[in-house]
UniProtKB/Swiss-Prot annotation:
UniProt subcellular location: Cell membrane; Perikaryon; Postsynaptic density membrane; Cell projection, Dendrite
UniProt lineage: Eukaryota, Metazoa, Chordata, Craniata, Vertebrata
Annotated GO CC locations: dendrite; L-type voltage-gated calcium channel complex; perikaryon; plasma membrane; postsynaptic density membrane; sarcolemma; T-tubule
Superkingdom, taxonomy of origin: Eukaryota
Subunit structure, as described in the record: Component of a calcium channel complex consisting of a pore-forming alpha subunit (CACNA1C) and ancillary beta, gamma and delta subunits. The channel complex contains alpha, beta, gamma and delta subunits in a 1:1:1:1 ratio, i.e. it contains only one of each type of subunit. CACNA1C channel activity is modulated by ancillary subunits, such as CACNB2, CACNB3, CACNA2D1 and CACNA2D4.
Residues with site note (Calcium ion selectivity and permeability): 118
Broad class of where this protein is predominantly found: membrane
Protein's UniProt name: Voltage-dependent L-type calcium channel subunit alpha-1C
GO molecular function terms noted in the UniProt entry: calmodulin binding; high voltage-gated calcium channel activity; voltage-gated calcium channel activity
Length: 177
């Protein structure tokens, strides 16, 4: 009964002091009664309390899964920058100005696109050998006219990344929640 009376007093004071900017009565104390109604509801239901407790406990393991995902993206982005960072940008392929391994943020964004399953096969095919190199990435004293970029490592790289994201990471994330 005390919680209901406190809530009614809170609503009444809020309505009365709504027009006044400088109210003398601090109504923050009465707002605690609204929270107490929720606590009272949770204390009655054993199932709701168990569900809430499980939900809170699962959030304790969530940062570790997030850290694992960040580490996976970081490692694969650095490897991708080293192996595929010199591929020339071409708007007709999947390696273009929006999707490339030339900078770290672009590499992470490209990996996020692959992790969601959006055209990762085409990106993999665009990173295979015999692709043109970016003219800005070649050394000035390079004499090779047919210098090609890309690597056969792309097949292992993209399939392993997709498998880790699709099966291991997503399953861990769902298992924690």
């Amino acid at each position: 009964a005390l919680i209901v009376v406190g809530s009614i007093v809170d609503i009444a004071i809020t309505e009365v002091n709504n027009a006044e900017e400088n109210s003398r009565i601090s109504i923050t104390f009465f707002r605690l009664f609204r929270v107490m109604r929720l606590v009272k509801l949770l204390s009655r239901g054993e199932g709701i309390r168990t569900l809430l407790w499980t939900f809170i406990k699962s959030f304790q393991a969530l940062p570790y899964v997030a850290l694992l995902i960040v580490m996976l993206f970081f490692i694969y982005a650095v490897i991708g920058m080293q192996v595929f960072g010199k591929i020339a940008l071409n708007d007709t392929t999947e390696i273009n100005r929006n999707n490339n391994f030339q900078t770290f943020p672009q590499a992470v964004l490209l990996l996020f696109r692959c992790a969601t399953g959006e055209a990762w096969q085409e990106i993999m095919l665009a990173c295979l050998p015999d692709k043109k190199c970016d003219p800005d990435s070649e050394p000035a004293n390079s004499t090779e006219a047919d210098h090609s970029c890309g690597s056969s490592f792309a097949v292992f790289y993209f399939i392993s990344f997709y498998m880790l994201c699709a099966f291991l990471i997503i399953d861990l994330f769902v298992a924690v929640i």
